[in-house]
Amino acid sequence: MVLVDRSDGLTGILHAVQVTYQKKQTRDTLRIRDHQAASKEALFPLYFMKTDAVETLIEKLLPLCTVVTPNIPEAEVLSGLKIKTVEDMEKAAQTIHERYHCAVLVKGGHFINDANDLLCADGRMTWFHGTRIDNPNTHGTGCTLSSAIASFLARGLDLNESIRHAKKYLSGALSSMLDLGKGAGPMDHGYTLAKDMNRN
């Protein structure tokens, strides 16, 4: 979950019911007092969550979100539909959007040949096309994307532009090919800093 009110951000996995209720209470006390009139939310993983926590999250938090960002398996849980094709992604996105009354960005990274994501917002479908980057170090891609979207929303960009900028940032972090430790390591979140240093 990523909560952004103005320049503040809070990230973390909501693994239990008690944490989810605390998050909702915190969210209810934080309101933007400018033209936005509501908090910016980008919601991610159902992984590692207990079943009752998933149910509570769906009931209490999804209706408060500006956008939820499930991957394919998570979108299947939220929609109750199997996703095997692009058409399935569209049906699932529409179902989640109508059921929880929030925008939904279904991430297509679990498909083999591309990294195309589908946004359903205000009853409209928008595809964000991307190129799959052959990098084994993909730990935290979903968290990075949702955090980046929330950050750009907090800077005043609209949802579509926030997603475009977030996907560009994520692609850059993957393309940098940082290789730390063993297994599926992290991406290079500071790749833009390295570019600036090299220019200087």
Can you name each region flagged by the protein language model?
Residues 1-39:
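Acidic, small/polar-enriched beta strand-loop surface segments
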Residues 123-134:
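Glycine/charged-rich beta-loop-alpha catalytic/anionic-binding loops adjacent to active sites
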Residues 76-77, 135-159:
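Short, small-residue alpha-helix embedded
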